[in-house]
């Protein structure tokens, strides 16, 4: 097995501060104003779908849009469930490669059948998706060699947070850099512990972080992993908790008064709890079995969540290497999925 720094996935994870800074340094205004549309749909597959959900959350909260993230395949096979003919509607189509079949087809249906305006978002000029949209947003700086999406996710998400009027996203690169230096060794140590199951939890913006964290672990390790909204997990899914379970809770300051109760409840059911968050109550941090705690001078939870994604990416990488997997080329996966 190669050394850690010989994997392109590792290089792309630790390059995130520089990639994000480079993207933010050259951003201009969005080519279209989402607030001028009655309906805004965002679509993609895999990580691009979770990226869409993250952006929809931020736009609804900070711009007042009526945005919804929908899998590309749903728009292809069930368009009338989502498209509303007659609305002034906008579709943002996300695909890292620009060659994901479902996403390109969804964009074409939106234009040809629904009369929507389409923004194509990808990393490759001249790709299939790049040629379809009325507007194009290109991120060639974060073209990735690895099958799994890491720095491209962070950089594109950061750009859209900036376009959500969250200027503080410009503060993230040095904060992420500092965290990588401080926490990498502990993340690697955590990856050596054998847990029977891993569940990521988060609320608000952190729910989208939990989903992307879950996908990174599934992709790189091939192991079953779950993601839920923090409080929804208590309504049925908590039945799976037992000794040998790890609950990785991304704590949201907006529901900080209930974090201690959540942690205690999961521990009472036999699970270990790792809590990660910014400016969280000391009682919650002390109650958890382990924690990654930050004291960042940030105002918005959407920015905080993006700043913590690298922790889950690193965990997935180190866990995969520990299991003898190749995180650059995970089993059963390809870089581009075509239908």
Spans of features found by a protein language model:
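Active-site phosphate/pyrophosphate-binding segments
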Residues: 5-7, 11-12, 17-31, 35-38, ...
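Glycine-rich phosphate-binding loops that contact phosphosugars or nucleotide phosphates
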Residues: 36-177, 183-184, 203, 238, ...
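Conserved phosphate/anionic-ligand binding catalytic regions in large, soluble enzymes, centered on
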Residues: 6, 54-55, 212, 309
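Phosphate-moiety recognition in structured ligand-binding domains
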Residues: 4-7, 133, 265, 270-276, ...
